[in-house]
């Protein structure tokens, strides 16, 4: 999240909203805020990556491909439910024979649990953080001291010792990278591109759809003019992008979501939420309750809370699923992604229906 001209009136001295009311008011501004935050970086990275396009394929070559014979797939994202529900164990126990699509942030979880995903998806253009999911060859204590992003997250306990975890990821991906296809966004940082090439992952390039390409000054149109690659509506986040790869690119008919929480478990300190520092910058610590929304999930009988970014991702996903020809099953068993067009069932129920 980043303050834009449209929301500058909100600051730590005059916030009157409570109980997440401000988050709902910000929904209409989130697309512009995202463009302000990442737009220049997306274009800079895409221009630099022109020199690497010949190291991979266009995403169009993956379209309607069957990575596995089955017409169903499981998406594994890295929401806080991942370490609680452990979908990899269920996949292996049930000898699931469908396609496994993992966000880059869930890739190390998969490999650590003996599961090699068929396709990995990456989107975020951040210069230094995203490469951590691939193993950062340059990570040291100085880098860790400069950015506590990973240390603050409610994530896989394996990341508690960050240096050791990084070395483990380096080793695992060096071993398994050549077996994995990756849908690599042109917005990706040079650190990620270098690491992907080093590991031998098979690259399929794509452009994220960042705005309406028919509008004047469209970033999406600039990307497409620059490289001619397919554009995919990623919904603002890698979890939704992974679902779109299953739906619009691979043409799957049944898609299970795991680790797609778009939220946090009750009791999680605000400090451990992904956009905590951005929230502090926007409204100040005393007004954080104005930005965090509570949801009761009727399918699991528990409540969860979310921030403006993940609230936006949720609303965008619910719009996108209406246009999908696939049947989407949320098997996260928690979180806030539920509504029309999504069947909320346990992951075991999905595996019983579509397992090996």
What are these regions (language model features)?
Residues 219-260, 264:
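ATP/pyrophosphate-binding catalytic subdomain of soluble kinases
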Residues 106-107, 113-127, 249-271:
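Glycine-rich phosphate/pyrophosphate-binding loops
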Residues 194-196, 238-242, 279-281:
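Beta-sheet-dominated scaffold domains
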Residues 1-97, 108-121, 128-205, 229, ...:
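N-terminal donor/sugar-recognition subdomains of glycan-related enzymes
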Residues 104-112, 240-245:
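Contiguous, well-ordered alpha-helical segments that form the cores/surfaces of helical PPI scaffolds
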Residues 200-234, 285-302:
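Active-site gating loop/helix substructures
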Residues 263, 267-301:
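Active-site phosphate/oxyanion-binding loops
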Residues 98-104:
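General structural concept
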């Amino acid at each position: 999240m980043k303050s834009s001209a449209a929301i500058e009136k909100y600051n730590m001295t005059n916030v009157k909203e409570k109980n997440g009311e401000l988050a709902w008011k910000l929904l209409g501004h989130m697309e512009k805020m995202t463009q302000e935050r990442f737009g220049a970086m997306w274009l800079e990275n895409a221009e630099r990556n022109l020199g690497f396009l010949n190291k991979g394929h266009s995403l169009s070559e993956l379209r309607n491909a069957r990575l596995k014979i089955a017409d169903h797939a499981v998406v594994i994202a890295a929401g806080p439910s991942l370490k609680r529900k452990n979908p990899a164990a269920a996949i292996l126990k049930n000898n699931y024979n469908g396609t496994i699509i993992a966000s880059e942030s869930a890739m190390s979880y998969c490999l650590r649990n003996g599961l090699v995903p068929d396709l990995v998806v990456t989107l975020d253009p951040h210069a230094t953080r995203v490469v951590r999911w691939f193993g950062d060859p340059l990570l040291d204590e100085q880098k860790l001291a400069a950015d506590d992003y990973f240390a603050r997250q409610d994530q896989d306990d394996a990341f508690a010792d960050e240096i050791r975890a990084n070395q483990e990821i380096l080793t695992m991906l060096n071993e398994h990278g050549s077996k994995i296809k990756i849908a690599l966004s042109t917005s990706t940082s040079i650190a990620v591109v270098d690491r992907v090439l080093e590991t031998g992952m098979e690259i399929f390039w794509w452009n994220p759809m960042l705005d309406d390409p028919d509008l004047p000054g469209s970033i999406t149109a600039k990307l497409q003019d620059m490289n001619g690659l397919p554009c995919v509506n990623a919904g603002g986040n890698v979890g939704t992008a992974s679902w779109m790869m299953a739906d619009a690119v691979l043409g799957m008919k049944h898609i299970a979501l795991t680790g797609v929480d778009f939220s946090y478990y009750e009791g999680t300190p605000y400090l451990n939420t992904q956009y905590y520092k951005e929230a502090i910058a926007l409204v100040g610590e005393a007004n954080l309750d104005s930005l965090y929304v509570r949801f009761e999930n009727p399918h699991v009988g528990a409540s969860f809370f979310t921030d403006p970014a993940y609230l936006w991702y949720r609303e965008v996903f619910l719009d996108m699923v209406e246009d999908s020809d696939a049947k989407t099953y949320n098997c996260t068993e928690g979180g806030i992604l539920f509504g029309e067009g999504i069947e909320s069932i346990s992951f075991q129920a999905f595996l019983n229906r579509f397992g090996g």
